[in-house]
């Protein structure tokens, strides 16, 4: 059983009670909500004549279903208009802070909260979204929850959970030039399998993790859930503190020094005991691309589609289905796979640093004639920064469509969808069957830099060929 890890410390600090059956009642320090998983939860409160327990601990924005092409109200999509109108009314009724379109603070919830300084070390954070683990990059313990638990947090500010085991993933050495956090996390998930993290929290550590920027760390923690882990986190350090400092919601003046001292006390240390430790050599990672229908089905750009015997046992159960759906055969190179659509965005890779690196790859290039390409900033703030730096012009001149903030083609709840059997090069987090809107659409996950390279060539390409020129 783990002891004295950051996870253990934060868990004990937020444990309200031991519950029958072995679970714990955990206080949630920050609750993030959006338009899709909150309406039923608010409806349940109304049915029981309950109010939100701590409105000041809940923050709302709109992201999942918002259109990214035309955000004038009322939306052309009646369902989007209805869902966002409902969230507006619920937040007004319960006095919840709401960052709506046009506020300058709207965007994907897992992009907005960190950039506002809402996400801080030592917090417990919950949201009705699978990728809430993103916030673990700051040394918080962050969980995705279902609608019934959204209701519970609104009503009591607590949830019932079984304590997780803690696995440390120690990433040795450093990533080479042209290799990014997305490549590393896809490599880790492939190495361990998509079910390896069930019942675990993942602590990411080691020289390769320390070398990452905060936005790259968010990419790592964001995809913890894709490896089966309930959450993933990184111990806070000077990079963490520097990122948070002077944000809108960060501690100020004398409270800042107190916060730093407390945050440092939470770090795992040489006395920490983990349930399991896995070592990854980051220097061996190359640009990585998924070939199948789980994020664990990935290979390096120089590799070929694996045979069944070469696939992690946790992923073999779905390999045959992946071969058939994706149209790949064992031994086929992933490089030069033709692409139809390119998407840069999502809570995994829709931040300003992601747009910068993709724009650097694009340079003065134009996208291939057969390619339809989208770039969707993760928030209004990201969009503003990108425009100030001229990044939007780089994308538009290359042939990309520049869109407004939202989840967009990551899950295709709006009109941003694949059509028919189109193949997508995507910087998002899931490549499940039909994930990007078409029942037969196929998704290849990769870094934003790799998406940019694919857009130029019209096929899966090694981004290092562009960076080394």
Swiss-Prot record:
Residues at which [4Fe-4S] cluster binds: 347, 407, 410
Entries under InterPro entries matching the protein: 3-IsopropMal_deHydase_lsu, Acnase/IPM_dHydase_lsu_aba_1/3, Acoase/IPM_deHydtase_lsu_aba, Aconitase_4Fe-4S_BS, Aconitase_4Fe-4S_dom, IPM_dehydratase_rel_enz, IPMI_cat
PROSITE patterns assigned: ACONITASE_1 (PS00450), ACONITASE_2 (PS01244)
EC number, UniProt record: 4.2.1.33
MF GO annotations: 3-isopropylmalate dehydratase activity; 4 iron, 4 sulfur cluster binding; metal ion binding
Superkingdom of this protein's organism: Bacteria
Keywords tagged on the record: 4Fe-4S, Amino-acid biosynthesis, Branched-chain amino acid biosynthesis, Iron, Iron-sulfur, Leucine biosynthesis, Lyase, Metal-binding
SUPFAM superfamilies cross-referenced by the UniProt entry: Aconitase iron-sulfur domain
Cofactor list: [4Fe-4S] cluster
Reactions the enzyme catalyzes: (2R,3S)-3-isopropylmalate = (2S)-2-isopropylmalate
Cofactor note: Binds 1 [4Fe-4S] cluster per subunit.
Main EC class the enzyme belongs to: lyase
GO BP term, example: L-leucine biosynthetic process
UniProt pathway: Amino-acid biosynthesis; L-leucine biosynthesis; L-leucine from 3-methyl-2-oxobutanoate: step 2/4
PANTHER family: 3-ISOPROPYLMALATE DEHYDRATASE, HOMOACONITASE, MITOCHONDRIAL-RELATED
Function: Catalyzes the isomerization between 2-isopropylmalate and 3-isopropylmalate, via the formation of 2-isopropylmaleate.
Family, per entry: Belongs to the aconitase/IPM isomerase family. LeuC type 1 subfamily.
Oligomeric and partner information: Heterodimer of LeuC and LeuD.
HAMAP family in alphabetical order: LeuC_type1 (MF_01026)
Stated name of the protein: 3-isopropylmalate dehydratase large subunit
Organism whose genome encodes this protein: Prochlorococcus marinus (strain MIT 9515)
Gene field: leuC
């Amino acid at each position: 059983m783990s002891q004295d890890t950051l996870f253990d410390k934060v868990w004990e600090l937020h444990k309200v009670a031991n519950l029958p059956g072995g679970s714990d009642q955990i206080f949630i320090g920050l609750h993030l909500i959006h338009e899709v998983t909150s309406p039923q939860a608010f409806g349940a409160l109304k049915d029981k004549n309950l109010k939100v327990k701590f409105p000041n601990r809940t923050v709302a924005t709109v992201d999942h279903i918002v259109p990214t092409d035309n955000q004038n109200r009322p939306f052309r999509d009646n369902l989007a208009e209805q869902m966002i109108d409902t969230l507006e009314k619920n937040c007004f009724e319960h006095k919840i802070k709401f960052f709506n379109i046009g506020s300058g603070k709207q965007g994907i919830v897992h992009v907005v909260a960190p950039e506002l300084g809402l996400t801080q070390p030592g917090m417990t954070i919950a949201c009705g979204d699978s990728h809430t683990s993103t916030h673990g990059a700051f040394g918080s313990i962050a969980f995705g929850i279902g609608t019934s638990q959204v209701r519970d947090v609104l009503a009591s500010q607590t949830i019932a959970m079984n304590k997780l085991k803690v696995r440390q993933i120690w990433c040795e050495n450093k990533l080479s030039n042209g290799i990014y956090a997305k490549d590393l996390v896809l490599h880790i998930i492939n190495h361990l399998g998509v079910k390896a993290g069930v019942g675990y929290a993942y602590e990411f550590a080691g020289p390769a993790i320390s070398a990452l920027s905060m936005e790259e760390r968010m990419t790592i923690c964001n995809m913890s859930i894709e490896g089966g882990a309930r959450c993933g986190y990184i111990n806070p350090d000077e990079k963490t503190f520097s990122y948070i400092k002077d944000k809108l919601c960060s501690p100020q003046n004398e409270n800042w020094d107190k916060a730093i001292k407390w945050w440092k006390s939470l770090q795992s240390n040489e006395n920490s005991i983990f349930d399991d430790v896995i070592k990854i050599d980051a220097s061996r990672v190359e640009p990585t691309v998924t070939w199948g229908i789980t994020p664990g089905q990935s290979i390096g750009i120089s590799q070929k589609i694996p045979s069944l015997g070469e696939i992690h046992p946790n992923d073999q159960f779905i390999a045959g289905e992946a071969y058939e759906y994706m149209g790949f055969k064992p031994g086929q190179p992933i490089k030069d796979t033709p692409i139809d659509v390119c998407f840069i965005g999502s809570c995994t890779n829709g931040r300003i640093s992601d747009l910068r690196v993709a724009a650097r790859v694009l340079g003065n290039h134009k996208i291939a004639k057969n390619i339809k390409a989208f770039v969707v900033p993760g928030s209004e703030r990201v969009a503003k920064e990108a425009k100030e730096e001229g990044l939007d012009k780089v994308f538009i001149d290359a042939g990309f469509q520049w869109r407004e903030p939202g989840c967009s083609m990551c899950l295709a709840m709006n009109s941003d969808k694949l059509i028919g059997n189109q193949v997508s090069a995507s910087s998002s987090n899931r490549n499940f069957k039909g994930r990007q809107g078409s029942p037969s659409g196929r998704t290849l996950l990769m870094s934003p830099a790799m998406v940019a390279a694919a857009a130029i060539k019209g096929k899966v390409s090694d981004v290092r060929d562009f960076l080394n020129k």
